[in-house]
Amino acid sequence: MISLMQLQDVAETTRLGPLSGDVKPGEILHLVGPNGAGKSTLLARMAGLTFGEGTVIFDGASLETWPAAKLAQHRAYLAQQQNPPFSMPVWHFLTLHQPDKTQTNLLNDVAQALGLSDKLGRSANQLSGGEWQRVRLAAVILQIHPHANPHGQLLLLDEPMNSLDVAQQNALDRLLSQLCSQGIAIVMSSHDLNHTLRHAHRAWLLKQGKLIASGRRDEVLTPPNLAQAYGMNFRRLDVEGHRMLISTT
């Protein structure tokens, strides 16, 4: 399969790399590793928000050559933190992110899927942390959703599961799976190894800015690889037909 994004010897001073890899259309790729591994730095680089050593090719062209407005049509990026806009209704904030403003049904569908239907009229700065996280997720999904944007290709998510309960995480997983089935590539950072083991197609395991392992989730999330990354021992178990990782240290 042709790659959507290629990274070649990408590096950030003291924080990242050099590392190389690729992202394929319609896949879910998880970035995993301990705090300080470089996941957020790598996502920002892939989003075109920072530049440094190495090359990032997106859809056949160097990421540095993409005009910001055009890039926003093709990729959406959820930063780890973002303050809510002052006194802006949620529906207005979401509409700003949706390229085709006529797709009101899509906005309502995404809001309903994430449990936001009763929050659309509220001001963004009056939401709880978990509510605001779901609003931000809805915004980036609307930005590149194929029903509102035929150019959408890539969704980058930095710790998207933060502040979400189990039911909300499950709802987000369903939405991401739907996007994936429509050809959108999804790259997200995660601290939940068992979530990665269940939902990722591929994984990159990082430690101190270095890529320790990359490939299919089963090939990457092995006890030896995880011990190298986290400095502790792991076991992989099968529990009622589901694979599970547990620490043994």
UniProtKB/Swiss-Prot annotation:
Q: Reaction catalysed?
A: an R-cob(III)alamin(out) + ATP + H2O = an R-cob(III)alamin(in) + ADP + phosphate + H(+)
Q: What is its EC number?
A: 7.6.2.8
- PROSITE patterns of this UniProt entry? ABC_TRANSPORTER_1 (PS00211), ABC_TRANSPORTER_2 (PS50893)
Q: What keywords would UniProt list here?
A: ATP-binding, Cell inner membrane, Cell membrane, Membrane, Nucleotide-binding, Translocase, Transport
CDD domains assigned to the protein according to its UniProt record, in alphabetical order: ABC_Iron-Siderophores_B12_Hemin
In the record, which residues are listed under signal peptide? Answer: none
Where, per UniProt, does this protein localize?
Cell inner membrane
Q: Give every ABC transporter domain span.
A: 5-233
The record gives the membrane topology as:
Peripheral membrane protein
- Gene Ontology annotations for the cellular component aspect, listed alphabetically: plasma membrane
- Segments spanning the bilayer are none
Q: Name one Pfam family in it.
A: ABC_tran
Q: Which PANTHER family match?
A: METAL TRANSPORT SYSTEM ATP-BINDING PROTEIN TM_0124-RELATED, VITAMIN B12 IMPORT ATP-BINDING PROTEIN BTUD
What's the protein name?
A: Vitamin B12 import ATP-binding protein BtuD
| Species in which this protein is naturally found | Citrobacter koseri (strain ATCC BAA-895 / CDC 4225-83 / SGSC4696)
Q: Which gene encodes it?
A: btuD
